[in-house]
Amino acid sequence: MIRISLDLMGGDFGPQVVIPGAAKALDRHPDISFVLYGLKEQCDPVLAKFPKLREKSIFHDCELAVAMDEKPSQALRRGRYISTMWRSIAAVKTGDADVAVSAGNTGALMAMAKFCLRTMANIERPAIAAIWPTLKGESIVLDVGATIGADAQQLMDFALMGGAMARALFEVERPTVGLLNVGVEEMKGQEEVKEAGRLLREANIDSLEYSGFVEGNDLGKGTVDVVVTEGFSGNIALKTAEGTAKQIGEYLRAAMSRTLLARIGYLFAKSAFDMLREKLDPSKVNGGVFLGLNGIVIKSHGGANAEGIAAAIEVGYDMAKNGLNQKIENDLKKYHAKRLPPMGPEAA
């Protein structure tokens, strides 16, 4: 049984969307049980519509919910110990849940997760990993917003964590990893990126295969299983991809409704357009994973619909079931053990 703690008040729509999303996830994975955190008056009427979910859940009434526009520092001061967001994270720390899921304020969620769970040994800063649709299927991109301006060692740590996530999610034995850069040549790019490339080449890590530098146009190609970058460029890439998907969707809608002939043509090509719409639907790949913490936290898009919430829950389910944090800890331990100077008689 995978136990998931869920912040019912997170996101733009709160329990009206989060609860139906949880019900969808439960239908697909009957071995999930939920620990729900919400405001009773708002949640009870919605929960009553989903008796199966209510039966597989424990509900905790909380004092407050973190606002979507609340500053992280304010949310931490005001909501520590008593908010739906904090308590959903704390359930992972106490062992009452295997993973926490929230569609709430990203900055507040990261601040609370870092404060409550703390970072793993040898991890200076956590990262947010996004699942990215590609021509070959899916890949992982990190960091997409947690760490702005990462140094070479932090990028190296991101590569290790991203590789562990790829093994947990895609079930590949040795995922390929690339560093996002302005070119594939070794002399190009910022010093931090070039140094991270050197570290990855020389580390000769058993759990991943370093494939060198990749460019922005490789993100959608699926050139590698994991793309590593720092949070500023990663977040811009993510938002650009989301905006481009919406733009293409709007272009198609406008083109297909412009004339009677276009509308007739759409009817003949409907299955192809439905397939494209499915590929461009952000809810299908919803769920950013906070990596590097002593516990698994999943961030859903704030504007996600019920299908998107279900997808984020399923990401958490997969991560917990496949032992994500154990894989990360093992990989970090092996890598940092190699970096330590020899001790005792061997050092002589």
Curated annotation (Swiss-Prot):
Subcellular location: Cytoplasm
Main location: cytoplasm
Organism superkingdom: Bacteria
EC number: 2.3.1.274
InterPro entries documented for this protein: FA_synthesis, Phospholipid_synth_PlsX-like
GO molecular function, one term: phosphate:acyl-[acyl carrier protein] acyltransferase activity
Top EC class of this enzyme: transferase
UniProt entry tagged with the keyword Nucleotidyltransferase: no
Keyword line: Cytoplasm, Lipid biosynthesis, Lipid metabolism, Phospholipid biosynthesis, Phospholipid metabolism, Transferase
One cellular-component annotation, GO: cytoplasm
Signal peptide location: none
Cited Gene3D superfamilies: Isopropylmalate Dehydrogenase
Any one biological process term the GO annotation gives: phospholipid biosynthetic process
Reactions accelerated catalytically: a fatty acyl-[ACP] + phosphate = an acyl phosphate + holo-[ACP]
Known pathway: Lipid metabolism; phospholipid metabolism
Subunit structure: Homodimer. Probably interacts with PlsY.
Function: Catalyzes the reversible formation of acyl-phosphate (acyl-PO(4)) from acyl-[acyl-carrier-protein] (acyl-ACP). This enzyme utilizes acyl-ACP as fatty acyl donor, but not acyl-CoA.
Family listed: Belongs to the PlsX family.
Protein name, UniProt field: Phosphate acyltransferase
Organism field: Rhizobium johnstonii (strain DSM 114642 / LMG 32736 / 3841) (Rhizobium leguminosarum bv. viciae)
Gene name linked to the record: plsX
